[in-house]
Amino acid sequence: MPLSEIDRVVQESARKLLQVSAPPIKYWLMVDTLGMDERDPLVQRTIAECKAYPPRLKLIRTLRKDGTWPISKSRKAAEDAGPGPPVGWTYITMLRNLQLLEDMYTDKGEGFISSALERILSWQKKEGYILGPHHDLFPLPHYNGYAIRNLIIYGMQDDPRVKRLADWLLSIQRHDGGWVIPYQEDVKYLPEYKHMKMQDFMELVRKGDTPKSDSKGFRDVPSCIWTTMMVIRGLARDKEYRRRREILKGADFFLDRFFKANRHEAYYHSEKNWTQFKYPPYFGSGLGALYLLTILGYGPGDERMEKPVRWLLDARHSDGFWWQSDRPHMQKDQWITGFAVDILQRYSKNR
């Protein structure tokens, strides 16, 4: 496709988005997409607007001294009935809100953000991983990818604990370049378990009555598209890791499967997940995949990118915006459009 078409779309949509967007979206659009200098008076004014942005202030205000946010009474009761954090909604809420705050131009020196990051690291095991949030039976690579992303975006990439988490994630990369959810996406496919209900199977895992999950085994089982994407999403936030062959191999894994159904029913089985527009993009989508791929340097020189980029262009509406899939939402549509414009601009620049 002509790169001039992409450049035109970027300029048109960016111009429209600048006119109506919330301060954080405007900031990232000006600095990341349009390359404006932080010292530009317009950028400085936008930063001041970000600092006063009510949703940002609310999240900072409700973050408690211990690094956690309040959760509903029902979720707190369920959490208290189990092993406690990091299992439960406290940890999930921390991960989500930390991402939202960084999106809204927040650094770790504000409020009790440092306490939240330290609390996450306090749950780290000696092997490097963090258990939770769904159970404490085994670590979930996609949530560990989510955790390391938050730690890196707040500038903790050189912390030895963060490096240990990254090393653990890389140590369980599989033969095809991807990752799976242990047990649920490898041992579960053994003949004696494949027809069992997941709940019954997980009870066997809890009792220790199954073979162990093995990232170097089960070579007949392909990795999970979305687990892989979540791990890469975390590690790719660090410039040093972006250059590592393991990261590019993981990116190749999900690029080669763009628009295809995930083999695993445990995590976004349908191919429809590729074409869903949503914000926040927590657990994978075509938009999230393209964002990662362009960050890693994929561009027009890779023919595998052509169909995904064409899909993104074709999904743009006549008003110059991309809309949330389940129902249009003005604020979320602005974020989604910001991501789309940034992806297209970076794709063109990677020529």
Language-model features: where?
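Preference for long, amphipathic alpha-helical scaffolds in soluble/luminal domains
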Residues: 1-351
